[in-house]
Design a protein with these regions (language model features):
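Short acidic/glycine- and proline-prone juxtamembrane loop motifs at membrane-interface regions
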Residues: 155-169, 343, 347
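Transmembrane alpha-helices of multi-pass, membrane-embedded glycan-processing enzymes
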Residues: 79, 83, 87-91, 106, ...
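Transmembrane-helix signature of polytopic, membrane-embedded enzymes
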Residues: 99-111, 122, 127-153
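Membrane-lumen/periplasm interface segments of specific transmembrane helices
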Residues: 18-31, 52, 193-316, 320, ...
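Start-transfer (signal-anchor) and selected internal transmembrane alpha helices
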Residues: 1-42, 235-236
Length: 392
């Protein structure tokens, strides 16, 4: 492992240790605002298990404890099967090690949190490797700067400490983008499938395959002609696109088969259970989150949106960087206009242009303020997480 990769891993481990310590100490000291975790865990309740079982982990755990990892209630359709399957697998491994005959909640939570931490360690490292590919003229130190910033000040540290979508999706999404750019298209397709199995918007990773394999070669030659080995390229672009959409397609097909024709979404022009469930249970939809009661969530996530928009307006644009800025812009629009806006705090780690801009403008007041805010808010978020207080 190279010098800067070792430095990034060491920084990530140190910062994770700080955030995990805050969560565990706060969990041991503070009582939960919501006692659902204690009720569900019963005798398996302790500071560690209680600190893991928060927010979306309830939904993941419900599916993980199901014999086949599937959903039981329709609101669980909003969550992709990747994390529940990972949790179930971890729980079964722990049960085997302990020579137990049953799958327990505590085994499942603790083992999956351990694995999620190992996987999320790769996120800053993959950002570094991706930066080296996108900006090959950068020195190793320049490429490491965004990764070190991500490692030191993620806006939502708890989501990287537990079996959550961010802990798994972020490194896999960054890995997908890097591998596609490097030409490892088959491996990238497998990684994209794994990433898309954890989060619905993983289907957007298909854009990297289409752009890098088919579009960028044409833009580089500046001639409207087929790139070399066009049949081979079309095949791999199709494979990557299918791999990116397959998990979402499967979950929507399963939901349609199990809920239709009774469910209201079945008669829509595009009968997607995902958008129906998001709107029904989380009030997602075009500008539906834009109301007075949500002002605190807008204010909490404002720094991410401000820096994210500034990064779009001041891009370090190259042909290799273009798809990252397109996905970055699309993600911000979807979050701001169609989703729970505070989710941007968790999504930030999967937005390379944000970290590229901050690292390139550390002499600006906005970048310095963002770093200071991220560090402070990250610690506060750990305490709020331990006490089972929003934002999720």
């Amino acid at each position: 492992m190279k010098k800067w990769e070792k430095e990034i891993i060491k920084t990530t481990i140190k910062c994770k240790a700080v955030h995990a310590s805050i969560v565990l100490v706060a969990s041991a000291i503070l009582s939960s605002f919501d006692t659902s975790a204690e009720i569900l865990l019963g005798s398996q309740t302790n500071a560690l298990t209680r600190s893991i079982l928060r927010w979306d982990v309830f939904h993941f755990l419900s599916r993980a404890m199901n014999s086949y990892g599937g959903w039981r209630s329709e609101h669980e359709i909003a969550f992709m099967p990747g994390i529940p399957l990972l949790m179930r697998g971890c729980g079964l491994v722990m049960a085997t090690i302990r020579d137990a005959h049953t799958l327990t909640l505590s085994d499942t939570l603790i083992a999956s949190a351990f694995l999620a931490n190992l996987i999320s360690l790769l996120a800053p490292l993959e950002l570094y490797r991706l930066t080296r590919v996108v900006y090959p003229h950068y020195t190793p130190a320049q490429a490491a700067a965004p990764a070190l910033l991500m490692a030191a000040c993620p806006p939502s540290p708890p989501s990287l400490l537990v079996p959550y979508t961010e802990a798994v999706y972020t490194p896999l999404a960054l890995m997908t983008a890097r591998m596609v750019a490097e030409g490892s298209w088959l491996t990238a397709s497998l990684v994209a499938f794994a990433a898309a199995s954890t989060r619905a918007n993983g289907c957007l990773l298909a854009g990297f395959f289409l752009y890098e394999i088919l579009i960028r070669p044409v833009l580089e030659t500046r001639r409207l002609c087929f790139p070399p080995r066009i049949i081979n390229r079309i095949a791999f672009a199709s494979l990557g696109t299918i791999a990116s959409f397959a998990p979402l397609g499967y979950t929507q097909t399963e939901a349609y088969a199990r809920l239709c024709p009774q469910a209201p979404f079945c008669t829509r022009t595009l009968p997607l259970a995902y958008s129906y469930v998001q709107g029904k249970y989380w009030d997602n939809g075009l500008l539906r989150y834009w109301n007075v009661s949500q002002i605190p969530n807008f204010l909490l996530s404002l720094p991410v949106y401000v820096v994210g928009i500034v990064a779009i307006c001041n891009p370090h644009m190259t042909l290799r960087a273009l798809p990252h800025y397109v996905l970055h812009t699309l993600t911000l629009i979807l979050l701001l206009c169609f989703s729970n806006v505070q989710i941007a705090l968790r999504f930030a780690t999967a937005l390379p242009p944000l970290w590229w801009w901050v690292a390139a403008h550390t002499d600006s007041r906005l970048a310095r303020s963002f770093v200071a805010w991220s560090r402070l808010w990250g610690c506060v978020a750990c305490v709020l997480w331990a006490a089972f207080l929003p934002p999720a």
